[in-house]
Amino acid sequence: MNQLRGRFAPTPSGELHLGNLYVALLSWLQVRQGGGQFILRMEDIDRPRSRNELVGPMMDDLHWLGLDWDEGPDQGGENGPYYQSKRLHLYEEALHNLQQQQLLYHCYCSRAELQAVASAPHGVASEGQAYPGTCKKLTAAERAAKAAKKTPSLRFAVDKGPTAEKMDVEMEKLLRRGGDFVVQRADGIISYQLAVVVDDALMGITDVLRGQDLYDSTPRQLLLYAALGYTAPRFVHVPLLYGPDGRRLAKRHRDLSLAAIRANGCRPENIVGLLAALSGLIERPEPLTAAELIPEFRLEKLTTEPILLDTHLLQLLN
């Protein structure tokens, strides 16, 4: 059996917040409890959104919390580079592979045009409107006319894809409901769906623990794993954290960033203990180091309900 390998792959577009740390901690615990290797990767493929100056502070925050990694941007490893922006040649090879199998086609639709298609069914939550197949039905003449005016994106033809392992009935429904999906944007940027599959496969990731918001992406990724001849990892999706305003934790919750919490004098043990209690690993919040929590980790202990960080809970961080 292959050694367990997990990862945490943040986008360096803002400071880490408690929601990011929740996923990072649980993923790290899963790997360390299983005696595996933990990889840190920066998902900076969308260069306009990414800020290199945030990578160092992100790693400092994770170390401060008590997390470490066996491979990553700061120490390298045999599966690098650990920045997506330095792995573009690998994504191009994957695109070529899919094109050779005739699984991709050019799409000239804009986001506005897709939103205007009232008959389109509800799509995939992480990607927006479902694609109605407009450009898949173009004649050669129509395609040539559009190509003369606009650079296309590349879409994966779902109905031509292979049978994917680990896909249950619910995932099959999600896959069909979302329609054909983009693997390369018109501006040349590789999609998250393709990049994350290539990275996880080539880095030998066996287990992916991530937020529930990415569940909808899983069937598309399973399809790409199958099409590229890769073995898919095991996926676990954990509930999201919500701020006192009832909205999912995001960069707008600046007072819940780790930088802000650290600046207020909070100890890492308090954060770890609170996140452990919220996850269901321990009964009530108590100061703990990340290492002390390793024996407590069991997937079956993890809560399946969304988590609200109310004012009372946040006071425990003071």
Swiss-Prot record:
GO process terms (BP): glutamyl-tRNA aminoacylation; tRNA modification
The UniProt entry, under HAMAP family, shows:
Glu_Q_tRNA_synth
Which amino acid positions bind ATP, per UniProt? 251
Q: Which cofactor is recorded for it? A: Zn(2+)
Taking the record's annotation, the residue ranges forming a coiled coil are none
- Annotated Zn(2+) binding sites: 107, 109, 131, 135
Could you say which residues bind L-glutamate here? 7-11, 43, 192, 210
Q: Which family does it belong to?
A: Belongs to the class-I aminoacyl-tRNA synthetase family. GluQ subfamily.
UniProt short sequence motif 'KMSKS' region, positions renumbered to this chain? 248-252
Gene3D superfamilies under this entry?
HUPs
Q: Which UniProt keywords apply?
A: Aminoacyl-tRNA synthetase, ATP-binding, Ligase, Metal-binding, Nucleotide-binding, Zinc
Per the Swiss-Prot or TrEMBL record, what residue ranges does the short sequence motif 'HIGH' region cover? 10-20
| Record keyword Zinc present | yes
Report the InterPro entries cross-referenced here.
Answer: aa-tRNA-synth_I_CS (IPR001412), Glu-Q_tRNA(Asp)_Synthase (IPR022380), Glu/Gln-tRNA-synth (IPR000924), Glu/Gln-tRNA-synth_Ib_cat-dom (IPR020058), GluQ/Sye (IPR049940), Rossmann-like_a/b/a_fold (IPR014729)
Q: What is this protein called?
A: Glutamyl-Q tRNA(Asp) synthetase
* Top-level taxon of origin: Bacteria
**Which Gene Ontology terms of cellular component type are present?**
cytosol
Pfam families named in the record: tRNA-synt_1c
Q: Which PANTHER family match?
A: GLUTAMATE--TRNA LIGASE, GLUTAMYL-Q TRNA(ASP) SYNTHETASE
Query: What Enzyme Commission number(s) does the record list for this chain?
Result: 6.1.1.-
State what this protein does.
Catalyzes the tRNA-independent activation of glutamate in presence of ATP and the subsequent transfer of glutamate onto a tRNA(Asp). Glutamate is transferred on the 2-amino-5-(4,5-dihydroxy-2-cyclopenten-1-yl) moiety of the queuosine in the wobble position of the QUC anticodon.
Q: How is the cofactor bound?
A: Binds 1 zinc ion per subunit.
